[in-house]
Every structure is written in C-alpha cells, then in structure tokens.
Regions:
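Residue-level detector of anion-binding/catalytic polar loops
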Residues: 13, 70, 131
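Conserved beta-strand positions in the central sheet of alpha/beta enzyme cores
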Residues: 72-73, 110
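Divalent metal-binding pocket/active-site signature
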Residues: 62-63, 74-78
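Binuclear metal-dependent hydrolase catalytic cores centered on His/Asp/Glu-rich metal-binding motifs
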Residues: 31-66
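Short acidic, glycine/proline-enriched helix-loop-strand junctions
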Residues: 2-13
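Charged catalytic cores and adjacent phosphate/nucleic-acid-binding surfaces used
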Residues: 4, 16-44, 79-189
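Anion (oxyanion) recognition and catalysis
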Residues: 8, 65, 126-127
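Divalent metal-dependent hydrolysis catalytic cores, especially in the metallo-beta-lactamase
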Residues: 1, 70-72
Length: 189
C-alpha cells in the first residue's frame, strides 16, 4: 500500500514489504515501496511455467528503486566457509549478490543464520569499498518446524533523538545505523 499499517502504535510500526523469489539468482526484499508490488513474484524454477531466468535481480532492483524502495538480499549464505572462494565455491543462495553490489543496485545483505558465511561475504564488500548495510531477519515459515522462529534475528536501527516512526526508521536504516543480532535483546545506552 505504500503506507504504515493501521495496527501500528507509537511503540510498534508495521509496514509490509515484498520478497522476490528467483530460484537461481537469490531471494531479495524491498522495503518502503510507494506504489505497487512488483511482478513476477518468482522466476527460474526449473521445470515449471516460471522457468525463465528473466527478470534478473538487477532488473527487479532497478524497478524497485524507481519507487524509492530499500533493496537487499535475504537468507543469502549458509555455513561457515566463504561461498565465493576456496576449493569449491558455490556462490551460495545469493549468486547474483556480488554483481548487484558492484553495480550499486542492492543496499543490504541480510544476516539470516547463526553462521559466518554472510559475514565473510559482507567483509569482502567492505574490503572493496562497497557499502552494504547489514540487516537481520530469518526465513521464518511459521508452520514449518525446521525454520527459525519469528524474531530470532533482528535489525535494530539507531534513531538518535527522533521518535519512532516508519520514516525515521527508514532514514536510519538507509544511513546504515543498524545492529544485527540473534542474541537476547540488547540494552543500548
């Protein structure tokens, strides 16, 4: 809708975003879109009617950017090893992330699991002077027992002296004023 949900309160703000789910390039998200959802919602599922690799994540990111959306990769990499290096690089679940990061079409990388792979890739970006904002979130499917519970990974955004609002939260997020955690709730002073 491009608007804060009516169930929001002064202490909690709800704004619904979108996940684009291509099987090959890697799943991505958009926050703060102002106009409409993007379609198709998925691509590259071999042996189905949506088998095509088009549109790429780069194409979809550019469409989302036209609406002012904040753009990132979700649940990108698992495991402890560098998915882009070593003896058997797999590129992980976010095969197009390094390209999108270099092109500047993506702003964030989600830290989704309690492992090091996404952090390693994030550090590669920083070491190459590519600013990527860390965010936290889990691929939680509430009726599937093997997925993370809702809220297991969180993104905290520093607002400074500004009150909580969607616009203030997004401003802090876009500036990279984030803390990502899967630990107990932090107390920030």
């Amino acid at each position: 809708t491009g608007k804060v949900d009516p169930v929001s309160t002064p202490d909690r703000v709800l704004f619904v975003g979108e996940e684009y789910r291509p099987a090959f390039h890697g799943h991505v998200y958009f926050l703060d879109m102002k106009d409409h959802l993007l379609s198709p919602f998925a691509s590259a599922y071999e042996g189905t009617a949506i088998h095509s690799l088009y549109p790429s994540n780069t194409d979809i990111f550019r469409l989302a950017e036209r609406q002012g959306a904040f753009r990132g990769y979700v649940h990108p990499y698992g495991g402890e090893n560098d998915p882009n290096g070593g003896e058997n690089p797999s590129l992980g679940g976010a095969k197009a992330f390094p390209v999108d990061a270099a092109l500047g079409t993506v702003e964030a990388l989600e830290m989704s699991y309690g492992n090091h792979a996404a952090y390693i890739v994030w550090h590669h970006m920083l070491n190459n002077d590519i600013k990527i904002i860390p965010t936290g979130g889990e691929d939680s499917i509430s009726n599937l027992y093997r997925t993370a519970i809702v809220g297991q990974l969180r993104t905290y955004v520093h607002l400074g002296d500004r009150p909580l609002s969607w616009d203030n939260w997004m401003t802090g997020l876009r500036k990279g004023h984030t803390i990502v955690t899967n630990s107990p709730l932090p107390v920030l002073t």
